[in-house]
Amino acid sequence: DDILNNKTDGTLNDNFYRALKKRVYIFTWEHFYPSKDYSLFVPTDALQKRVDAFTKDFAPRCVGVHIRRTDNAVSMGKSTTEQFIAEMEQELLAHPETRFFLATDDQREEDLLRSRFPGKIISNQSRTIDRNSVAGMHDALLDLYCLAASDKIIGSYWSSFTDTAADMRGI
Protein backbone atom coordinates (compact mmCIF):
# COMPACT_ATOMS: atom_id res chain seq x y z
CA ASP A 1 0.00 0.00 0.00
CA ASP A 2 2.84 2.42 0.77
CA ILE A 3 4.10 2.11 -2.77
CA LEU A 4 0.67 2.77 -4.29
CA ASN A 5 0.09 5.76 -2.00
CA ASN A 6 3.42 7.32 -3.01
CA LYS A 7 3.20 6.76 -6.76
CA THR A 8 2.44 9.63 -9.12
CA ASP A 9 2.85 9.79 -12.87
CA GLY A 10 4.17 6.22 -12.92
CA THR A 11 7.08 6.89 -10.55
CA LEU A 12 7.58 6.91 -6.81
CA ASN A 13 7.81 10.21 -4.95
CA ASP A 14 11.26 11.37 -3.82
CA ASN A 15 10.05 11.47 -0.20
CA PHE A 16 9.27 7.77 -0.37
CA TYR A 17 12.82 6.97 -1.52
CA ARG A 18 14.30 9.06 1.28
CA ALA A 19 12.10 7.30 3.86
CA LEU A 20 13.41 3.87 2.89
CA LYS A 21 15.77 2.14 5.27
CA LYS A 22 19.38 1.83 4.25
CA ARG A 23 18.88 -1.63 2.76
CA VAL A 24 15.81 -2.86 0.95
CA TYR A 25 15.13 -6.38 -0.29
CA ILE A 26 12.68 -6.64 -3.17
CA PHE A 27 11.32 -10.02 -4.26
CA THR A 28 9.20 -10.02 -7.40
CA TRP A 29 8.96 -11.49 -10.85
CA GLU A 30 7.29 -8.44 -12.30
CA HIS A 31 8.21 -4.78 -12.74
CA PHE A 32 6.71 -2.56 -10.05
CA TYR A 33 5.80 0.05 -12.59
CA PRO A 34 6.97 1.00 -16.08
CA SER A 35 10.47 2.28 -15.53
CA LYS A 36 13.83 1.78 -17.15
CA ASP A 37 15.63 3.77 -14.46
CA TYR A 38 18.15 1.54 -12.73
CA SER A 39 20.06 4.39 -11.10
CA LEU A 40 19.06 3.04 -7.69
CA PHE A 41 20.88 -0.21 -8.48
CA VAL A 42 24.31 0.60 -7.09
CA PRO A 43 26.51 -2.38 -6.24
CA THR A 44 28.44 -2.40 -2.99
CA ASP A 45 32.20 -2.02 -3.29
CA ALA A 46 32.65 -5.74 -2.62
CA LEU A 47 30.18 -6.70 -5.34
CA GLN A 48 31.69 -4.21 -7.80
CA LYS A 49 35.13 -5.77 -7.25
CA ARG A 50 33.70 -9.20 -8.04
CA VAL A 51 31.95 -7.87 -11.16
CA ASP A 52 35.16 -6.16 -12.30
CA ALA A 53 37.11 -9.41 -11.83
CA PHE A 54 34.83 -11.11 -14.36
CA THR A 55 34.20 -8.27 -16.80
CA LYS A 56 37.92 -7.59 -17.28
CA ASP A 57 37.89 -10.72 -19.46
CA PHE A 58 34.95 -9.54 -21.59
CA ALA A 59 37.06 -7.74 -24.23
CA PRO A 60 36.97 -7.59 -27.15
CA ARG A 61 33.41 -8.98 -27.24
CA CYS A 62 31.28 -10.83 -24.71
CA VAL A 63 27.76 -12.15 -25.08
CA GLY A 64 25.80 -12.88 -21.93
CA VAL A 65 23.95 -16.19 -21.79
CA HIS A 66 21.25 -16.74 -19.18
CA ILE A 67 19.97 -20.31 -18.97
CA ARG A 68 17.28 -20.92 -16.37
CA ARG A 69 16.51 -24.54 -15.64
CA THR A 70 15.47 -25.33 -12.08
CA ASP A 71 12.18 -23.53 -11.46
CA ASN A 72 10.63 -21.93 -14.54
CA ALA A 73 8.72 -24.50 -16.59
CA VAL A 74 7.66 -21.93 -19.20
CA SER A 75 11.28 -20.93 -19.75
CA MET A 76 12.52 -24.51 -19.93
CA GLY A 77 9.91 -25.42 -22.53
CA LYS A 78 10.65 -22.46 -24.80
CA SER A 79 14.42 -22.04 -24.34
CA THR A 80 16.03 -25.36 -25.14
CA THR A 81 19.71 -26.11 -24.75
CA GLU A 82 19.91 -26.77 -28.48
CA GLN A 83 18.58 -23.27 -29.19
CA PHE A 84 21.18 -21.71 -26.91
CA ILE A 85 23.95 -23.70 -28.60
CA ALA A 86 22.72 -22.71 -32.07
CA GLU A 87 22.65 -19.01 -31.09
CA MET A 88 26.12 -19.23 -29.58
CA GLU A 89 27.47 -20.94 -32.70
CA GLN A 90 25.98 -18.16 -34.85
CA GLU A 91 27.69 -15.57 -32.65
CA LEU A 92 31.04 -17.31 -33.11
CA LEU A 93 30.56 -17.52 -36.88
CA ALA A 94 29.90 -13.78 -37.03
CA HIS A 95 32.45 -12.83 -34.34
CA PRO A 96 35.06 -15.56 -33.69
CA GLU A 97 36.64 -13.52 -30.87
CA THR A 98 33.43 -13.69 -28.81
CA ARG A 99 33.43 -15.08 -25.30
CA PHE A 100 30.29 -15.89 -23.34
CA PHE A 101 29.40 -14.96 -19.79
CA LEU A 102 27.18 -17.80 -18.58
CA ALA A 103 24.63 -17.29 -15.82
CA THR A 104 22.79 -20.51 -15.05
CA ASP A 105 21.22 -22.41 -12.19
CA ASP A 106 22.14 -25.80 -13.67
CA GLN A 107 25.66 -27.21 -13.41
CA ARG A 108 24.97 -29.77 -16.16
CA GLU A 109 24.21 -26.97 -18.61
CA GLU A 110 27.46 -25.25 -17.72
CA ASP A 111 29.45 -28.48 -18.09
CA LEU A 112 27.89 -29.12 -21.50
CA LEU A 113 28.64 -25.59 -22.77
CA ARG A 114 32.20 -25.66 -21.43
CA SER A 115 32.85 -28.88 -23.35
CA ARG A 116 31.11 -27.54 -26.47
CA PHE A 117 32.86 -24.14 -26.39
CA PRO A 118 36.26 -24.70 -24.75
CA GLY A 119 37.96 -21.52 -23.57
CA LYS A 120 34.94 -19.40 -24.47
CA ILE A 121 32.86 -19.62 -21.27
CA ILE A 122 33.25 -17.19 -18.37
CA SER A 123 31.17 -17.90 -15.26
CA ASN A 124 31.14 -17.82 -11.51
CA GLN A 125 32.22 -21.42 -10.99
CA SER A 126 32.13 -21.10 -7.21
CA ARG A 127 28.55 -19.82 -7.15
CA THR A 128 25.89 -20.79 -4.65
CA ILE A 129 22.76 -21.93 -6.45
CA ASP A 130 20.43 -21.61 -3.42
CA ARG A 131 18.65 -18.33 -4.16
CA ASN A 132 17.20 -18.24 -0.64
CA SER A 133 20.63 -17.87 0.95
CA VAL A 134 22.53 -14.61 1.30
CA ALA A 135 25.46 -16.06 -0.67
CA GLY A 136 23.04 -17.17 -3.39
CA MET A 137 21.54 -13.68 -3.60
CA HIS A 138 25.01 -12.13 -3.83
CA ASP A 139 25.94 -14.56 -6.61
CA ALA A 140 22.69 -13.80 -8.45
CA LEU A 141 23.51 -10.08 -8.30
CA LEU A 142 26.98 -10.82 -9.64
CA ASP A 143 25.41 -12.70 -12.57
CA LEU A 144 22.91 -9.88 -13.16
CA TYR A 145 25.59 -7.17 -13.32
CA CYS A 146 27.84 -9.30 -15.52
CA LEU A 147 24.98 -10.04 -17.93
CA ALA A 148 24.21 -6.32 -18.01
CA ALA A 149 27.86 -5.59 -18.85
CA SER A 150 27.84 -7.86 -21.90
CA ASP A 151 27.48 -6.66 -25.49
CA LYS A 152 24.43 -8.78 -26.17
CA ILE A 153 22.27 -11.20 -24.17
CA ILE A 154 20.95 -14.58 -25.21
CA GLY A 155 18.38 -15.17 -22.50
CA SER A 156 15.73 -17.46 -21.21
CA TYR A 157 12.16 -16.98 -22.36
CA TRP A 158 9.80 -15.54 -19.74
CA SER A 159 12.60 -14.64 -17.34
CA SER A 160 12.51 -11.34 -15.48
CA PHE A 161 16.21 -11.87 -14.72
CA THR A 162 17.07 -11.83 -18.43
CA ASP A 163 14.74 -8.88 -18.97
CA THR A 164 16.24 -6.87 -16.10
CA ALA A 165 19.82 -7.42 -17.29
CA ALA A 166 18.82 -6.34 -20.80
CA ASP A 167 17.01 -3.26 -19.44
CA MET A 168 20.02 -2.32 -17.31
CA ARG A 169 22.21 -2.46 -20.43
CA GLY A 170 19.65 -0.74 -22.65
CA ILE A 171 19.37 -3.72 -24.99
Describe the role of every protein-language-model region.
Residues 1-94:
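Secretory-pathway luminal glycosyltransferase catalytic domains
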Residues 66-70, 89-134:
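Catalytic donor nucleotide-activated moiety binding site of glycosyltransferases and closely related
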Residues 75-77, 110-115, 164-167:
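A short acidic (Asp/Glu
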Residues 77, 102, 136-139, 154:
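Aromatic-acidic/polar surface patches that form glycan- and anion
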Residues 82, 119-150:
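Donor nucleotide-activated moiety binding/catalytic core segment of transferases
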Residues 85-92, 114, 150, 166:
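Non-transmembrane alpha-helical segments in soluble domains
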Residues 140-171:
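A donor-sugar binding/catalytic signature common to diverse glycosyltransferases
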